[in-house]
Amino acid sequence: MENECIFVSSRGILKSTNIHTVQFSSSNPLILLDDYKNITKGSIVYVCNSAIKNFIQTVLPTLKDTFVLVSGDSDVSVPDDILSITEFNSFLEDPRLQHWFCQNLVVPTNSIHRKLSHLPIGLDYHTISSPGNQHPWGLHELPTVQEKQLLEQLEKNKTLQQKVFLAYSNFHHAIWGIGQRGDRQEAVNKIPKDCVYYEPNFTSRDVAWAHQSQFHYVLSPKGGGYDCHRTWEALCLGCIPIVKSSNLDPLYTNLPVLIVKDWSDISQTLLKETYETFSKTRFNMRTLYLSHWVARFKEESAKC
């Protein structure tokens, strides 16, 4: 269902490949060999980032043809959390690997291999899409219905007379958890309080979308991994996400994202100057759309 949506999402990417597991489970480190027995020349293969090492050990030795790899659906950093540098480089140089599109890729910008491309985690349509799944974000809704809600909010935003020159925050309701989210606590400690509107209470996601749409900026520290769904929600809603500089910076090329070296760099002056600059800049928003990435996958597949 996510592959029928307009905007890029983790599961939309997964379901747009022609070889992938049929039992979706985020951060699953194991490969089901039967899911990968039909890889042929030009196949676009999806593997959970947590299972990359298992894929290299169990599936790769059985392959003869060149393929395109797409990976994500996990908070682990690639390669740091899953492969040694030797294993990583050896895999990249394997002639059967045509190209690798990877989420949470933390290779230094100046040493990106020619076969590597950053891939956004995009929106999260899957968390509340399972029937009977109760979640603080809201009631069960199909991915297409969730996207319809987002598009309706985007349409409402056109009637806003003026946005507030502050950065909206709701991440502070989940400071601790996966990976301890130390970046979030650092953001709270360092960002001047007069630059931020902190949502006083935890809200459902649709309410959060409505509230953040009233502000020019949205604070987006790390999620469970380096990338965060909040960043992509903000962009889709017409807000400017603020992120701390990292090896993910290439993901934001040609997008209205404010990247700061340190959270303490944020100021009222920076917010106003950035808005003035961005309002005169022509951005290319194509990376927000699932169709862009599917076309990229097929382009590499055609080279096999």
Label each region the model flagged.
Residues 263-264:
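Short helix-start
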